[in-house]
C-alpha cells in the first residue's frame, strides 16, 4: 500500500472501530478457523501446509486480543475436530503439538492473567494424547479462578457426539432415579454440554468461504447469527473482525419467532 492508501485504510478502520465498539457487542463469539492449508499453498506458496497451521495459531493470538479489547466475554474456537484425526499422521501430530504448546503458553501468559481469562478445552479428553492432556490441565488449573473472560478451545470435538454424551448423562440420571423423565428439558441437556458454563454463541463466524457448520456446536448455535467470509483464517484482519461484529449488530435477532 502507498502512503495515501495506508492513511485512508487506517482512517476507515479507526472510524469502523469507534462505530462498532460504541454499540453492544456479542457476548459469545464462536469461530470456525478455516483455510490454513489453502493459505499455505496459495499465499505462502509452501509445500508444507503445516506452515499455514502455524500462521493460524499466530492469528488466534491476535483475535483473542481483539475480543478482549471489544469486551467480548466468551470466545470459542474450533481447533481440532474428531474428524481431523483421519488426516495424515504427520499433520495430526503437528496440530496436536501446536495446541499443546499453545496451552502451556496460555497458562503462563501475562495477558491471560492480567485480564483474568479462564481457559478451557471442550471435547473428548479420552482420545487425546497424554502430553496434550497434561498441557490442557496446566492451562485450566492456572486460570480456573478467573471469570472476566472465557476462552474455550475445541479439541477432539464433535457436535453430534457431544449431544449423544449429554443424552446418555440425562438417561443415566433417570435410570438412577435422580431425575424424572418428565423433567427432561432443553435446559437439562444444555447443562450436560461441554459449554454448560457459558451462554450459547451469539455470533458464529467461519473463514475461508466454506458455507457449512462442520459439526461444530450444533446444539448451541440453534439461534446464533452466522457470518461467513471468503478470507483464509491466517489472513483475517482486525478490520474483518470489526466488519463481522458490525454485521451482527445490524441484524434483528428473532430466535426462531
Question: Locations of the language-model features?
Answer:
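Flexible, compositionally biased loop and terminal segments
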Residues: 1-257
Amino acid at each position: 500500500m502507498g502512503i495515501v492508501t495506508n492513511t485512508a485504510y487506517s482512517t476507515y478502520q479507526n472510524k469502523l472501530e469507534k462505530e462498532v465498539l460504541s454499540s453492544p457487542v456479542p457476548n459469545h463469539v464462536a469461530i470456525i478457523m478455516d483455510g490454513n492449508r489453502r493459505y499455505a499453498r496459495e499465499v505462502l506458496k509452501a509445500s508444507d501446509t503445516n506452515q499455514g497451521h502455524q500462521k493460524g495459531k499466530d492469528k488466534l493470538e491476535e483475535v483473542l486480543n481483539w475480543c478482549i479489547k471489544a469486551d467480548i466475554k466468551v470466545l470459542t474456537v474450533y481447533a481440532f475436530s474428531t474428524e481431523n484425526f483421519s488426516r495424515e499422521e504427520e499433520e495430526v501430530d503437528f496440530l496436536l503439538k501446536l495446541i499443546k504448546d499453545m496451552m502451556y503458553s496460555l497458562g503462563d501468559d501475562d495477558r491471560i492473567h492480567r485480564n483474568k481469562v479462564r481457559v478451557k478445552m471442550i471435547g473428548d479428553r479420552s482420545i487425546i494424547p497424554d502430553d496434550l492432556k497434561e498441557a490442557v490441565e496446566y492451562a485450566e488449573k492456572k486460570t480456573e479462578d478467573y471469570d472476566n473472560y472465557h476462552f474455550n478451545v475445541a479439541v477432539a470435538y464433535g457436535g453430534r457426539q457431544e449431544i449423544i454424551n449429554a443424552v446418555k448423562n440425562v438417561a443415566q440420571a433417570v435410570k438412577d432415579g435422580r431425575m424424572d423423565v418428565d423433567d427432561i428439558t432443553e435446559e437439562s441437556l444444555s447443562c450436560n454440554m461441554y459449554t454448560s458454563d457459558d451462554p450459547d454463541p451469539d455470533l458464529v463466524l467461519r473463514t475461508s468461504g466454506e458455507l457449512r457448520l462442520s459439526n461444530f456446536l450444533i446444539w448451541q448455535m440453534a439461534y446464533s447469527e452466522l457470518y461467513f467470509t471468503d478470507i483464509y483464517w491466517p489472513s483475517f484482519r482486525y478490520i474483518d473482525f470489526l466488519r463481522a461484529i458490525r454485521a451482527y449488530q445490524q441484524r434483528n435477532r428473532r430466535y426462531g419467532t
